[in-house]
């Protein structure tokens, strides 16, 4: 019987080898659905998804408590309450806390804005290649300018190079960065993006609460006005990084004040679907929260926490808070 067992072992080994060879001949074609890699931006669906995420990112700024904390704590408008921790005490005017670079809640804006800026970079770089209309790409241009405008008002000069070059989509982790000056942020990023957006965006929103020419004009007028005041600097407020308060294009504060006025007038004379409400009550009434005065918003749902982006019953500080009215 020994030869028979030997033959069985040989045949079994050969069969196993044949099975392994056949099973490993094809490379597994992965189709990840819970996460995305940078090549997703090389597809039309990826570009469209990137633009959609930019509306959602508004919730993670204006819908989270720590952003408002970073705006109000440390002023005479608010103080810490009985259950407050260091998030609220550290920046309080009373000096009850210890404010440092690691205890302030500036991350509420910094982290959210820069991740969205990189997404916008990816959309802008790849949009034309995958055949997406420039009007959709200009929505990304608007949001990139939107975030840089928030950042430059809060921190002064901030990096335009996230690791792959100025205003380039970055996929390489980096622990260092170089902060551009305030004039560079305005003249290289904010103004060009908004001007291009105005030229290509529609008068009527593509989606409910979406970006339009009127919205872009509003932010361009605000950016011109803010930059003009920075150039004028009547109170001699220091800036960071230190730089001369001169415009790279040779314009002075008066020129930018005039530009702000002209853009605002154009927006008023060409409002699109927007207009003023008849009374302040109509602006503030809960059932009327999608009225003609609302130029931009990220809508939410009170039916599904996944699509809402935050709890429908609990406010945790970081996640968007959209609790039921009442």
Q: What positions do the PLM features span?
A:
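Bacterial N-terminal signal peptides
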Residues: 12-21
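Short coil/turn linking the two alpha-helices of tandem helical-hairpin repeats
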Residues: 152-153, 159, 205, 223-235
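Bacterial N-terminal signal peptides that target proteins for export
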Residues: 2-12
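Short coil/linker segments at helix-helix boundaries
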Residues: 157-179, 183, 230-259
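Elongated scaffold/linker segments in the mid-to-C-terminal portions of large proteins
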Residues: 45-46, 51, 55, 62, ...
